[in-house]
Amino acid sequence: MSVEVEYLQHEDYLYRTSKLKEIRDLGINPYPYQYTDCLEVQEIRNQFVDNELGDSEAAFRKETPKVRFAGRLVLFRSMGKNAFGQILDNDAKIQVMFNRDFSAVAGLAADAGISPIKFIEKKLDLGDILGLEGYLFFTHSGELTVLVETVTLLCKSLISLPDKHAGLADKEIRYRKRWADLISSEDVRKTFLTRSRILKLIREYMDQQSFLEVETPILQTVYGGAEATPFVTTLQALHAEMFLRISLEIALKKLLVGGMSRVYEIGKVFRNEGIDRTHNPEFTMIEAYAAYWDYNDVMKCVENLVEYIVRALNNGETQVQYSHLKSGPQVVDFKAPWIRMTMKESISVYGGVDVDLHADHELRKILETQTSLPEKTYVHASRGELIALLFDELVCDKLIAPHHITDHPLETTPLCKTLRSGDETLVERFESFCLGKELCNAYSELNDPLQQRKLLEEQMRKKALNPDSEYHPIDEEFLEALCQGMPPAGGFGIGIDRLVMMLTDAASIRDVLFFPVMRRIEAKKD
């Protein structure tokens, strides 16, 4: 029983493999080992911007600068004794000109029976990767061009490029075949180059604030730091059950105990839960913790960090347009300070409900009549849980401008200090929202080991009553570390994928992940 791989039967693949054989028969290696001492195309474009560089006649006389570079052939047209192509390298393109009497093919023997220009026209295809040496000139229309002296085939492409105008129209194919998507779409390349720059800017800012970047384990014996379902695996060497981390928090707090006063980590986190427009089971976070801070200090850090990134990406501007809200395009200003309000205030302002004027049964009635939540989610909920549900249902998607929503109910987290005012029903937690989505979660971190144990044990009791709940097991090593003594601290976590979505005008988290999780396609079998 053989497995059919569709592209192997495609006419274009068969045609290109026949060319591959012909190229080898000519004594040319279509997959050489290296091609060094190259400039990048963007470097060439940056260095040579003066259109008085010289015309093609000067290039033919070899009087203009000579360059050596490599890239993928993405356009080609033959015009008599000349042929023109376009080379793509990273996100930059440059025009090249091949000439019947000037251009040579590396490795092509003089008695091969085919001229260099015919080899270029007949044996090369769009998608091939080429090394090129030649002389720069400007065309009459001002186009920077390279008159190619020598072309070296570096990789023969056996699959045709996506249509240059339509690109990959099917989104699922784009996500599955990201390599082709990157080749065909300038916008997609720009998105991922911006993602890379955002990561660089985050590190730049955190380093400026004297944070130390660290690495902590992805495989853990106890998972914690968030309410989420973990991925479970087995470590064969120890015959032990292990978990992929659902958060970076616990390990970073242990480093605070060890005397590292400001730490952060950028890394992958895994949650075995749903997939939708803003959620992927594998995602990237930054978590950071600073000794002697509280959540007020963290608020300033978060909004200044995001403003720093936005200004760097937008030539000093703080406004960003986002096009994918149901209400239509919105312009968001990330300039600090952001709007701050308590969770109760936000429910009053955006949901029209003053929770302090309503008893628990009245809050349940509001959830019943104004939301589509199933009754089981709120029928036995505590008052704090009811308030959190009202916020989720009535407020979140209305927070378009950047907001810090502060002072959450105690029930929402066991890892945070209660309000210093003495109200033990609320905690010093804030979540940052923008464009209707959560961007950041942050606390004045709980460092009282006895109170921490009490809250975690309360979670375990709730788990015993509801086996389907997401409450995580107690990490005794973490509690031992707290007993050693953790300084007062503030900490935050930001979902980097979601931040990139907001800053690149992406409709889906899949648009900012090179390889998002996709349903497996079963291969066709005979």
Swiss-Prot record:
CDD domains: LysRS_N. Disulfide bonds: none annotated. Its EC number is 6.1.1.6. It comes from Chlamydia trachomatis serovar L2b (strain UCH-1/proctitis). This is Lysine--tRNA ligase. One of its GO terms (biological process) is lysyl-tRNA aminoacylation. It catalyses: tRNA(Lys) + L-lysine + ATP = L-lysyl-tRNA(Lys) + AMP + diphosphate. It is found in: Cytoplasm. Gene3D superfamilies: Bira Bifunctional Protein, Domain 2 (3.30.930.10), Nucleic acid-binding proteins (2.40.50.140). HAMAP family: Lys_tRNA_synth_class2 (MF_00252). The keyword Metal-binding applies. Mg(2+) 2 binds at E438. Binds 3 Mg(2+) ions per subunit. The keyword Nucleotide-binding applies. GO terms for molecular function: ATP binding; lysine-tRNA ligase activity; magnesium ion binding; tRNA binding. It is an enzyme of class 6 (ligase). It holds the Pfam family tRNA_anti-codon. Its cofactor is Mg(2+). Mg(2+) 1 binds at E431, E438. One of its GO terms (cellular component) is cytosol. Homodimer. Keywords: Aminoacyl-tRNA synthetase, ATP-binding, Cytoplasm, Ligase, Magnesium, Metal-binding, Nucleotide-binding, Protein biosynthesis. Belongs to the class-II aminoacyl-tRNA synthetase family. Transmembrane segments: none annotated. The gene is lysS.
